[in-house]
C-alpha cells in the first residue's frame, strides 16, 4: 500500500492528503472488482490505473471553479474524473456537489454504489 501511495506524490501541489490517497485506493479496488462484469477500464490498464487514470483525472482539479457549488461530469462511465474530483473535494472539505450523468444502467449503479461507500457529495 505504501508503494502505491508514493505514486501520488505528484499531486502534492493540490494538497492531496494521505486520506485522499487511501480513498483513491478504495475506488481502484471497486473498479477492478466490477471491471470483469461491466468493463469499466481496459484489462491492460488495471496494472497502471494510478498513473494512467487517477493522477490524470486529479490534475483536472486546477480547472474547477471553487466558487461554484456544482460540477458536472457528463458520460461519467467509470467515474473518472467525477469520482476522483469528488474524493478530493470531500477531503478538502469543499462543498461542491458533483452531478454524474451516465446512460448505462449498470455503470450508473456502479457510480451510486461508489458514491455511497465513499460518502461522496454526488
Residue spans for each PLM region:
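Class I SAM-dependent transferase core
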Residues: 2-66, 106-107, 113-118
Amino acid at each position: 500500500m505504501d508503494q502505491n501511495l508514493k505514486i501520488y506524490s505528484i499531486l502534492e501541489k493540490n494538497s492531496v492528503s494521505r486520506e485522499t490517497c487511501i480513498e483513491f485506493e478504495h475506488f481502484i479496488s471497486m473498479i477492478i472488482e466490477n471491471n470483469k462484469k461491466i468493463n469499466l477500464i481496459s484489462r491492460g490498464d488495471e496494472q497502471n490505473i494510478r498513473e494512467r487514470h487517477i493522477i490524470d483525472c486529479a490534475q483536472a482539479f486546477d480547472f474547477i471553479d471553487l466558487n461554484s457549488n456544482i460540477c458536472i461530469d457528463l458520460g461519467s462511465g467509470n467515474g473518472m474524473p467525477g469520482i476522483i474530483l469528488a474524493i478530493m473535494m470531500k477531503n478538502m472539505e469543499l462543498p461542491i456537489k458533483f452531478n454524474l450523468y451516465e446512460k448505462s444502467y449498470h455503470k450508473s449503479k456502479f457510480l451510486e454504489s461508489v458514491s455511497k461507500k465513499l460518502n461522496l457529495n454526488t
